[in-house]
Amino acid sequence: MNFTPKQIVTELDKYIVGQANAKKAVAVALRNRYRRSKLPVEVRDEITPKNIIMSGPTGVGKTEIARRLAKLVGAPFVKVEATKYTEVGYVGRDVESMIRDLVEVSVRMVKDRKKKEVENRVMPIVEEKLVEALYQNRRVVEVDVDRNKLLQDLRDKKCEEETVEVTVLDNPKPIMALGNGEINLGSMFDGLTPPRHKKKKMTVKHAREALLQEESDKIIDMDNVNEEAISLAEEQGIIFIDEIDKIIGKSKATSSADVSREGVQRDILPIVEGSTVPTKYGNVKTDFILFVAAGAFHVANMEDMIPELQGRFPIRVQLDSLTKEDFKKILTTPKNAVTLQYSNLLRVDNINLVFMDDALDEIADMAERQNRDDEDLGARRLHTIMESLLEDVSFNATGEHPLLDVVIDRKYVQNVFKNKAKLIANTKPKFGFTV
């Protein structure tokens, strides 16, 4: 999809409050990818992505911006934590595993797309097998079973939860060998033994999915899938490296820990600069993958990164701590607004939450104060507050009553939290519904 930077920011605004500078930076980076794709090959190969590094406290939207961006354009995306990697030669994950993870995501994306493309071709085969399974079920209790009616019921999804016995491919879990090589012994011996089938009992819904997968795999060219997946990862892949500040030592390495952190930085450097990483699907060039790094940078500074790595993240963005106004917007404005999430959950049990405006002010004020006075958790602070605020409502709701309105106003919030600055877990008001 060819979104303009303004359109990208507009889409991000639907889910993320504030952080205009970060949204603008990623929007421009994404649009530049599209611009690059329209250039002649000889020019295109000279233009590499401008990687981004974000600085800001936890919970202010760093990860969500990158994730929503990838979802918006259908790009393969992985989030990794810098602290999980160790220097080459030590036990732990090597940095190249982030590229292998990205390719795995890309393969799944391409395979899912191919599966949808061939679904109409394989569906008659799947339906035939399911009708036969349903026929065997029904003939036990019915003398005259109409296969055409079974097929229609199947297409109308009238028997989704009925249990049937079908013969499907037996897929044992692959054996994983941990270590720097991360060898998957299961995939290593793929194709050396004939596929095994076994009869399994499952619902029609799950049987359809299993049979669709099996029949699709028979006609999907996996060599073609792998080629497309590698190209997709190379040209559109996005890797989000979180907690990058945790692998940054102080200005001068003074301990073995600082030296080790610098070693991880130097291992990451060729990946970000552009190198070729071998995977089980083929070699992957990292030159045009977009890297987005992020960290709180409470102790270390961006300037403490090794200079070579600093140079590979030319776009630097500072994300702001959330204000009371931001918290109030998070409660009500986004498509996935916090109050809407809890309202949808409790409506299952016939509870209609009604949040008054003064209650939203109170909750937002509490979130801002607690983040300022204690640890800054960003938007995650709201979930802590909301869980405690609605604990009694959630506990007492059974769904065995007509739809009830529960009004949440300032007084209700203050009764639950007698001190705005601290959550007191053992001080809960007597629960009651306001109809």
Question: Where in the sequence are the language-model features?
Answer:
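Non-catalytic accessory segments flanking P-loop/AAA+ NTPase cores
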Residues: M1-V435
